[in-house]
């Protein structure tokens, strides 16, 4: 049967109903079903002709392969979708009026705008019908529909035959699942729904009469899983309903007559006094104008909005975002506008409200248990809390040839702070998510920065009723996923057996799988998983009952195949190949270190909480007396260790002094505990720390200890602590840095490691075969300190003297290794680590040897410089007694650290980002540091400068404006050295940003009086065009030192070439090289260049290859070349010149190059 006319009638009826939201809903539904492209969807929204819009929609529906499915889907999702309006008296939890919601608006001049107007639709319809349509072309696409009737037996047989087709079953299952919401909100649609589903799923025909007794006062039962999203269409199956499915309806006692044949058109079923609206059964062609759908007398209440909209309510009611087939416009209303829902005159009866069904009891019970579990967890870590703001991070291409992505290091002033806690950040990020797509959010930071506290705070926040965009939050510490083999199911990932178990039965798991967009999965300490490599490209698991590996489950989530649409939150240390797994992350954040002010605040709170507030100032004085520990206190875990030792020293009442190294700090903390330990307890704990670190773990079973006494001692002394919420008897080291220290203790005193293998654990020159991955990244510094520092006050204070004597042999091995190192071959990060190791040794010979080998130019471009790095680098530069130039761009160095390095007398010049440097100047000027400000200005250089982004041009403009403000008289002697001494400037912004940013650069070019090389190509087509050349030419009189001008690939035509030729004589005495390679210069431009060529007395090389001038232009250039004996090369090969002409010109003058 040809359905075009029937579909067209339905669409025309819908478009004439004056409900623009239904029109938009229909178009959005077609877009979601991929029946429309986004471009065609946008065009239909702007279609001004209603009849044309109806024809285009009908043609789109007709082009679908299965016409019946198209028609049924359209009826379910568009025609019978209830319009939801919010009452004007509705208020949210904050007692804010929500009567005004988002005004989606309509495209100007479109049919949607016409529907929103106040014009009478019937008047417009007749007016349009009377218009002259003679000029329009009418195309008959289909014949009249077949008017034959079909009875129920034939229809059932047809459905049974189609069930043999897999695609047909899946498509009908799609319809059956997606239209649940459409039919469940009103009794009208509830009846139609059950009739439809019962008829599809019945294995036998209905009897002629069915008697359904209903008890008086019985409430209608609601279907389960009201919010349930349909799974992927490839996995949907049509589940036949039982013959008793009509029991879901509250029908009057009596008989229901089943007709085996239905009349053509609309058939109305109504029951007086039942409170039910009329039921319409459609068959055949829908009348277009003379038949009108009866309106419902039911009052449809507002649906609670989803959590990402204002006014969200209980999570047990479906939100607007959860309705699978309800487009967004159908759930919003215009400002100060309500839709008329008054009953028609032919309908009577009281209004009835519909109560939305809740979740299944098992799902609701599981959610409450999960919330109670998170509420019971302790939220505050040991010690005080100091609020820090997350910093947005990004990945960039590495500097090596592997093309791997790594975490970028922004300049200090370029940092983007994410205000608010992680819960607020998740709220903002979720607002930007694409529907149905998995969202990956990563929170990175060094050990001890508080990442796990951030993660636990999110789960606790959700348990307390916030983060309403999620129905379930699963907080999973990754150490609980350490089970070998292919024995993992999805429920094992969400609720690991080693955690406090929660009963997740199949019903709960099925609900979670069908509602992944309401799930937040938190994987804490992701670096502890061995299965983190290759997650984006490796094989992934499935939702089948068969178990798979943990890597397979994680790969399925990262590849957006399992729980597609969920939110995945990772916390990890930024190391190893983690960046490869995060290359497609939606958002990456970093937990920053303490600032100096925050570190002091932490110390004050620590002493206040411990009841010794009077020792605050004394403790701060002790810390300020040790600059290295002061710089390390930017790490919260080290700051806590400093507070603990300071408190112990002040309680002793003796002359207190903190140690000068990080190794000394931990030796002082663990020394008293080691003296009161069982025999060999510290060595045993050190061995466990090392073995766990080699396996990337930080937790262990209590049975790993040799005795209960050793375990009790470790827990009592605060070295180990119970893990949260685990069912097994597990312990974890109190901090990652403590585990590193204990691992270094094991290396320093054991005999199991050969001497020749010891240097690899300094991680300075990794081996090519079986390299040491340095997961315990604090081991190298502690190992150097334990081996080299005096035995009595270091290693001897922790272990027995006989055991400590082993360190003497290891000291000789490491001394020989350190003195053979060639510092010039080390990368910036390993050079800093070497400086730290040399400082921890406290051996003057090793420290001076390393310092004197430092090269004169030190580049830390792209390497993160922490406060401890700045301190040891400054000490090394002072010890070296030579001049240095530093490149500190993209290091993230703090302004105070930058000032400390710049103020060193041995630093003669430095490079840093323009924004960071100018921020330092402003800070020094405000502080009155005139001498340091002068040094910072004189040592700063930007030679050579390459502009790769608009921000680079803006910063350069700010630098020039700063100079003009300080030197309004334009005295060259008072110019900033960075501007006065700039000799090479490259401009590489590309063809899009180049034309936009070049006018700013041209405006400030005259300030660079010493500029010798101006490269406007730099392997990037900037395409500044003729306008750019015109602006550039105006600056030539001030660029008296310019020797090289590269204007290649800039889309210059004859107009620009003529402008350039007019201005070139201003550079006659300085310009040596001119390149106009690959532009659009024709004969006229070539002629103008030929005319000015004899005036360029200093020009040596000119390149005009790959332009568009012909033999005439080439001959003019060759003739002019005869008058220029100073020119050495004229490159002018171009495909528009005949090869014979070029050869002839080259024979006349050998200086003409055709290569």
From Swiss-Prot:
Residues 224-233 have a biased composition (Basic and acidic residues). Residues 171-210 are annotated as: Required for acetyltransferase activity. It holds the Pfam family LRR_6. InterPro entries: Leu-rich_rpt, LRR_dom_sf, MHC_II_transact, NACHT_NTPase, P-loop_NTPase. It is found in: Nucleus; Nucleus, PML body. Interacts with ZXDA and ZXDC. Interacts with PML (isoform PML-2). Interacts with TAF7; interaction inhibits CIITA acetyltransferase activity, thereby repressing transcription. Essential for transcriptional activity of the HLA class II promoter; activation is via the proximal promoter. Does not bind DNA. May act in a coactivator-like fashion through protein-protein interactions by contacting factors binding to the proximal MHC class II promoter, to elements of the transcription machinery, or both. Alternatively it may activate HLA class II transcription by modifying proteins that bind to the MHC class II promoter. This is MHC class II transactivator. It comes from Mus musculus (Mouse).
